[in-house]
Amino acid sequence: MTHACSFTLSKALNFGALFVRRSKFHLNCLPKCSCTPFRMESSSSLRIGNIDSRGALVVLEGLDRCGKTSQCSRLLSYLEGLGHSVELWRFPDRTTSVGQMISAYLSNQSHLDDHTIHLLFSANRWEKRSMMEAKLKAGTTLIVDRYSYSGVAFSSAKGIDIEWCKAPEIGLLAPDSVLYLDIPPEKAAERGGYGGERYEHLEFQRKVAQCYQMLRDSSWKIIDACQSIEDVEKQLKEIVLDQVTACKKGKPFSLLWSCDSRDCLKYGRLAEFVKFLL
């Protein structure tokens, strides 16, 4: 493990231990930090600069083995064929130092406290945030295989408070489209390669599915992933092309879960500490 990697892990472990000890977490419990205080907004739609045209942020979510990775690749080829600038991203990004720690955890090569690994997953998204915004502003559409919703669903499935799980994600860019590939956990378990990593167990996936239900809102597009690959692909293409067109016309960026609810305010500064990990 590199020095930078071990330093990040040490900080994450310290923060994770603090959060575990304080089951009722309040702002006055937090250690001092030089980060700029994060302002909570009552609306999640915040314009970032004057953008005439930009790329779309499209996120595919769902249980393990629901078909996300295959559909992401198909969407990439489709948009490239239409002449759009487009890239495929995946979270966790296992190429970074934080991502390598996550990869070791997922492959059962290491063990971390549940709160600690959640903060590392969030840090993995934060370390790509500035690049993500720059790519979108430059007109590149990003097809993203898993995002913050996965982090929240999987951690809350372990019994961690869902608002606590959402708090480190506050301030990340919100997707223009969330495409949820819906499949019963039992059906997903029948697909090849299931069970290779830490979370790929039927009972846990059932809990994850329940947590996804809590996260869904009217903006999500729910796709029946039990259909043929071709039928799923056809539906996704139509939705994504509409979003790409809207973003080229200057659709404003939004931020994730910006709110003024009591729980958001109570846990809101977690995002500052996640950024401090990097």
PLM regions with names:
Residues 2-52, 76, 186-278:
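NTP-dependent small-molecule kinase module
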Residues 50-76:
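Walker A (P-loop) phosphate-binding motif
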Residues 75-78, 105:
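Hydrophobic residues on the short alpha-helix immediately C-terminal to a glycine-rich phosphate/catalytic loop
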Residues 82-173, 235, 242:
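ATP-dependent small-molecule kinase phosphotransfer cores
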Residues 87, 177, 221-223:
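Structural signal for short hydrophobic segments within the conserved structured cores
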